[in-house]
Amino acid sequence: MAENELRLLNNAELKLALAESEDSFQSLVSVFLCPILLKLDSPHESVRNKTISIANHIMTRLNNNAQAILPLEALVSQYVEANQPLRKRFLLAFISIGEKRIPCSENLALLQICLNHVNEYPLVLLTLTIRLLRFSKPTSAITCSNDVILSLSSFYLIQKDQRIFSDLQFSQKTVDYRLSLLRWIHLSSWPSNWKWLAYFFASADSHSEVARLADEFTRDSGLPDLENLSHVNVLLDIALDKFRIEALHANFSVSISLRNKAIQHLLKSKIAANTDKAINCIEFILEAPPSMQPRLIQFTRWVVDKADPNFLKPKAAMILEKILSILSSNIIQSDLLRGFLYTTIGLLTKVDNHLITNSLLTNLLTSLQSELPDVRVSIDEALSIIIPYYSNFRFSNELLPVLEPFIFDSPESPAAYCALRFVLVAFPFDYLPARFICLKVQNPFVFHHSFIEEAKKGLNLSQWVQYNSVYSTNEAQEEDKVRAASYPSASEVISFILSDHDLKKFWESNAAEYCLAILEFIERCIYYSADRSLELYDNDKLSSIDALLIQDSKLREMVSEKCISLSNFNVFLEYVFYGTLLMHFEPTYALSRLVSFAPPEVTFSLPELDFLTSVFNFPLALRNTATRILGIILSTKDSTRISEVLSSCFTIISTSNNKNDNFFKAETALLIIGYTISYLAAQTNSAAVDSFILNSGSIKEFFSVLLEYLGSNVLHKKTTSLAIYKELFVYFTRDWITSYGVDFDEILNVLLRFLKEVEDTNVKVECLHVISRMSLSFSDDEMAEKILKAIYVTYHMDSPDILFASAEAMSILAGGHRNVFVKSTCPIFFQKQLDNYKADHYCFTLDFILTDCVNSPKPLLRRASSLWLFYIVRYCEPQTYTMTRLNDIYHSFLSFLVTQDDFVQDTASRGLKAMYDVLEGDERKSFTDNLISTIAADRVDEKTKAPLDADTALFTTNKGTVATYKDICSLASESGNPDLIYSFLSIAGNSSLWQARKGLASGISYLGIPEDQKRKTFSFDTSKSSSLLKKLYRFKHDPNPDVAKTMGEIWDTLVPSDLNLASHRKYLVEDCLEFMGSRSWRDRESSVNTLVSLLSNVPVTEYLNQLEDIWNMSFRTLDDIKESVREASFPLCKLLARSVIQSLEKTSHNTSPSGICKGKRIVSVALPFLLKHAYDQAKEVRSLTYSTITELVRTGNSTLTSFVPAIMQVMLEYLTEYESKAATFLDFHAKNYSIKQENIDNARTSAVQSSSMMDTLEKCIGLLDESSMQTLYPILNRMIAKPGGVPTKIGSAQVVMLLVIRRGPLVKQFASKLLQSLKSSCFDRNAAVSDAFASAIGYLLRVCPLEIASQTCQEIIDKFYDGNTNEQIISSKLTVYASRYAPDVFLNLGSLFFPFIFFGKHSSSISINGVLSKAWDELSSAGSSVNLYSEEIILLIQKNLIVTKWDVKRPAAAALLEFVNTSRLTYRQNDIYVLLNETMKDKSWPGKELLLEAYVKFLIKYPEFIKSQKMEEVHQVIVREFKRRNIVYKSHAMESVGELLSDENYRELDLYELSLNECGTFLQKEWFDKDDELNLEEKIALQRNSVYAMFNSSRPGNKNCNEMLLTYLSNALDENYLHWNVKLAILKNAPHLKKIMSNEEFLLYKDILYRCYEDNPSPKAKDYAEVIFGENYLSVLRN
């Protein structure tokens, strides 16, 4: 065996040795190398040695032949299969050699082998794989695993030990490798699991091309799955700089920018928050680089906020400790970051509330005082998170000492406010120390007003409950807390706050606000314990308590009983008493209430002497209340004390005069007497009062003074008298009063006169109160009738106060002493005497109202009678006669319900409630059924029907009565405001029954209908029930708040609590849709409101079949003529939009067939409708449509794909529609406002690029597929080609660019056609549009066929040569954009672009040559590029030199000049010479001087070529051009000819004499003064060039010419007009003449030079003199 193997090896070795050419050697290696290497596995040592020898020989030959290519596919295949180490080493050596010699052709088989095994042999195959990818196009035939993609992605990182990628990373081709790998990953069908990682790493690449491409791919689809644990772990490893790929056994360094990017991604991942590595990130904060700390702090907050509490809880204490250490160390100075840390503390406590300690609270409150304002916001947020856990705090007694110092030691600090919040939340409401803190805060001298208001929430139970509901963490616990919340016992409060104090000194030593707060809080406690259901204790400032106590006898009794039951009521009464002595309003009113509740034995203890002394000094506003209090107190005293006080008061009255002081005292004394004797009579009787009055004459004098005051013109006297009469007539009979000589009739007549004549409303009101109470003192029907008529005549008085006073008076007349208003004025323990009084005026009063008033056609009387009837039913005790007239009362109230007066309706509804309260048993049930049937049957009783027809008089205006519908229309037309017709007609559109429903509500809302009866009513087995449900639900969303409220009450009362509204949604929606088209705006608006309520929080799929109808009607009402309807419709439209968007977002995440199907259904209904209304005339509709479509597109749902073209069309057109009008205006008037058009164009382009429409368009591009692209193309083509708005065209160009960038393969088939459209439109008159189209063409060149690209670019570039500046600019920009966006195509079309750039950069337009010069500098290699494209450049120049357009011909000449200067013309000298020679024959034209300069440069550059055969021709050309008459051209010609004649190769050209003849004239002063063609600077330049030409044309041996030249110069100097610049030119060119002059000539020449040097301001004059005469130039010149 060994011999055979050796023989084979020898043969192979021989063939290899005999291989003479490199090709034959490579062929043999391809055949024999792999089989030879297999022999390394031979068991025979001799074979192995021979194999090694041959392998070494081959390797030596390969090292000497760098072009040899190895059979890598066979080598790699053998390597991955080899087991023998020796063979592997040799295989590796050959693979290493062959890897660097890979041919530039695809080898997909080798690539697939490498991809299959790269993770097994990364050091061998990874770099080879990347090299192979560079020369291969992505194809689905090549497969790759996720792990391999992960390994390949690491190519963009730096390996810490630099073992794997070092060759490629430092290669000159590294950018190509990086780009090719990116493209493969993006375009191939490889698994997408790790593609994002390659983009992610490459986005931070140091090579901008790579980073830019990676960013494009990332935007397209390259985001990690942030809920994929493997992705998240990689990101966390990157953030921690611990990224490792196990398959490569390598760790990689990651830049800080990438680590920050990784954290930015993690800030969106919930799963990341639940990993141990996330906790490591938190621990890493202090050690992290400063630039990473902000992101890590944000991530910490994210982790704490999003982590599973069960995961985070064991680590919470450590994290809290870490955060506190960071904050205390002050390493983090940023306010924002410190704020994040404080917020994180709050979030941590949500995870583990055991972290909440008083120490932590103290720390946070202290920080709140010391940190900057921006950080305090976050601390406050953290404290707000912590607060709810204190609502069930375990150590309340330990907490209060922590909080109090922050509140009282620094009341102005933010910590004080926060500490107060904890006081409000952490303690039960009945915890007195906490309430006491709130009370102590009520001191305006120490605490700010807002702080006081916050503390008041801790003194009001309902506000406290509402405040605590915000901080609820557990709904059930919160309900228990609210249920258990109660005011503390009033006795406990009094004992806690007042028992240990001298109450008089307490008032004097503390702020009044603090004392008053205590009083108010104790009163709330009393009322709370009396009856919690009434919630009197929570009425702000107890403002309504007096009115309620007047109207509710039971409540008065309950409060009285509660006061008596207080063990320390005396202490509280004394406290209020001393507050009253200080003349504060609140204590005075409170004491008035309390003495009415208190039994006589309690009131007896109050020191009346102190009060009597003070009462005369009370302000007028409190005087009546104070004297009433004193009257009650005195009435409980013994007879002696009463007699003494009354005697002193009588004395004051008798000694009074007209001085103010005495008058007020007398007035006060009258009040004291009146109240005292009244309450004495209330306790006993009127006859017993006589025993307290020692002198009967005094009482007569008292009544006499009262009557005198009543008739006085002084208002105070009158009101005082009325107040006393009002009280007296309640308790004293007519007989008792007349026994003292009082004329009862006279008093009544005075009062009736006042009602008619006095203008003061308050006096009239008091008169009504008095005359109604006069009826209590007699039973005379005739007198009662007189009083009744006096009350009746007040109905026409237009004052609400008088109206309500008349109703009270009417009820008192009817009800007598048992009337609620009468009983409420008497102290509760004195009311027993009132029960003995009787009155029988009830029947005739009720009859009068029902018969003479209710059915009156007078609106004011009906208004008054409705209130009178209500007051009698509500405030008089029911009698037998009430039941007799019950049916009449009922129908009267129903008749009031159909009145158009809201007040009458409300009154009637209250009357129905009052009737309901009067009835019992079957009568109450019958009443309830009747009302319900009235609504359900949609009818009104025949007696109450009030129909409207065309001739019904509805209301009146200042133009008269509006009687008919026709009159309404006329009035609206004449008013000039047609909108009014809707307001007017809405009245006719609402039946009287509708108005009745509003009134019925209050009555029905109080009916306690059983649930069974409700279910029976709404059983929906009849159309009546269904109709009722629809109407009730719609009516309770009426635009009128009162109607809506009352209808809501009806709904709550009539509709079963367990009604399943969802099952009836369809029918309710149909009803609303019907009424949204109603002529009545109220129907339309209520229907809109109903839909908002009905569809809120309902998935759109529940009403998808009705969605289009709903949306259609909502858009219709959005453009309603009534503003309130429009305003109501906007929330409905937003609701529908939000529902569609949310439903579509859910289906975006649900990729199951059912989810996709649901998404398609939603889109198929919503989008066609929205697109149809995208061009609606109503601005609001368009705006809403736009916002909805935008949000739908943002969901990225694939079901939108088929609608994307239409959406894109709308967005493109919206770009123009919603462009700022200012931009359009300025575009038309730019010149008028001296604004550069370029600035306007840039602003408009920027606005388009940054607009929300472009964002939507970009999202749409991501949703396109082949089918939708087919639809989009004609739309896009039309947008580009048709005339339209500038923004739309710019947007269309942007779309084309985005399509190429993001969806290149998709747009490729349409690229050619789009290119044609853009080509036709790119020369738009608007520069911004042209620029955008040119840019789009640049992008399209990437994906269109090369032939089309060449043709298109050629046609656009050809426009340059037409000479139009705008077209030239566009052509230039296209070239730049092609080089920038399609560099490969640009290079392939280099023969087109480079010659054009070279030609165009010589344009005389700055905007053109600037662009193209920069492009030439960046893209070309100067002379090399010129030489490479010399043939194309010459043809281009030659073509444009023969045209007649100077703005094209001149650049051609300039280009030719540069071409001559920079190119190598070894083989093209004759062609250039012929071209120059022919073009020089033309007459002078602007720019020909450049041609002459090019001609001279060519002559100087190639003298041998010229001298051989062209000298004579050159002589003719130079002479001809020298003699041209065009003065401007001649100046340049002198310079060029001078340059040629100065060249040593052309010394034989003798043009000395010609030069003097042509140039001498220009040195004459006569020419200088007369020539008008040139300006001064041009004349000086011409003279300089003349000097230059004459001096350089000088030749030796021509004495005459020398003399002529010196004469010209001397004469010019003699005339002393030469500019110093011309003199400097003479000095500069002097050496030419010095060489050829004789000594005699030189003397004259030296004088000329001296005169040129003398006084020449240029420093160069000295330098030129030194060149001619050496260092001693000055002495030489002077001599």
Swiss-Prot record:
Tagged with keyword Phosphoprotein: no
InterPro entries cross-referenced by the UniProt entry: ARM-like, ARM-type_fold, Ecm29_N, HEAT_ECM29
GO biological process, alphabetically ordered: ERAD pathway; proteasome assembly
Record carries keyword Cytoplasm: yes
Subcellular location(s) per record: Cytoplasm; Nucleus
Keyword entries, A-Z: Cytoplasm, Nucleus, Proteasome, Repeat
GO MF term (any one): molecular adaptor activity
GO cellular component annotations of the record: cytoplasm; cytosol; nucleus; proteasome complex
A Pfam family this chain is assigned to: HEAT_ECM29
Subunit structure: Component of the proteasome.
Family affiliation: Belongs to the ECM29 family.
Biological role: Stabilizes the proteasome holoenzyme, probably by tethering the 20S proteolytic core particle and the 19S regulatory particle. The proteasome is a multicatalytic proteinase complex which is characterized by its ability to cleave peptides with Arg, Phe, Tyr, Leu, and Glu adjacent to the leaving group at neutral or slightly basic pH. The proteasome has an ATP-dependent proteolytic activity.
Protein name stated in the entry: Proteasome component ecm29
Native source organism of the sequence: Schizosaccharomyces pombe (strain 972 / ATCC 24843)
Lineage: Eukaryota, Fungi, Dikarya, Ascomycota, Taphrinomycotina
